[in-house]
Amino acid sequence: FIKADVAAPGVDIFSASVGQGTEGVYNTGTSMAAPHVSGIAAQVMQAHPDYTPAMVKAAIMNSADTDLTNNAGSKYAVDRMGSGFVNAKKAVNAKVLVYDEENPERVSLSFGVLEYPLDGEDHTVTRNIVVRNMDSVAHTYELSYQYGPEIPGSSPEVPPLVTVEPGETVKVPITFSTYTPFLEKTIDPTLEKEQTAMAYVNGQYQPI
């Protein structure tokens, strides 16, 4: 399945620290990002006390901003940013939730590992996502699929539109087709093809 779920502020974050008295400390990492997400989850729970943990997670993931790029303008792939960069206001105001039908607690849909022979045939698999409208008005969405990065030999298909009436839950089929002779591994454009491994030693990062 897909991880991470979301991206959050986690670089050079000033926070409280054990043993610092009234002072704080700057840190970087998931230890700084996780409290941001926890705070947003608390806000969603306060606004929607009837939401289950899976619904709170869906509200945060569905509302995340997807236009997250590096300094060169290349967009991060889903395995680096999840569903996007957390947006507290949008998460609190989320009244339409989208999640995987088979694994609603995961929210994101994954086709898993697809293993096919090199037989020159098309192979197709379909999974459903659920769109649940808890608003008092109907919502219509245009659907599309955005690669990150593009995978030669594959072809996703989604319906062009979906409409959910107030209080309605709709299943939307997501189809993924592969043509094995053309399949090719591609690299996230935000990553370098050659990278240096680093180790954290005595408070500093050092190349291995």
Model-derived features with residue positions:
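An often Trp-containing, charged/polar helix-loop segment at the C-terminal end
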Residues: 48-77
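Buried hydrophobic-core signal for structured, non-transmembrane domains
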Residues: 6, 82, 124-133, 174, ...
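Short acidic, flexible loop segments centered on an aromatic residue
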Residues: 134-152
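Catalytic-core environment of secreted peptidases
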Residues: 1-35
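Short, small-residue alpha-helix embedded
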Residues: 33-49
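Intrinsically disordered, low-complexity Pro/Gly/Ser/Thr-rich segments with frequent PxxP/GP/PP motifs
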Residues: 154-200
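Beta-sheet-dominated interaction scaffolds and their linkers
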Residues: 88-134, 158-164, 191-202
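Short aromatic-acidic-glycine turn motif
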Residues: 68-70, 147-158
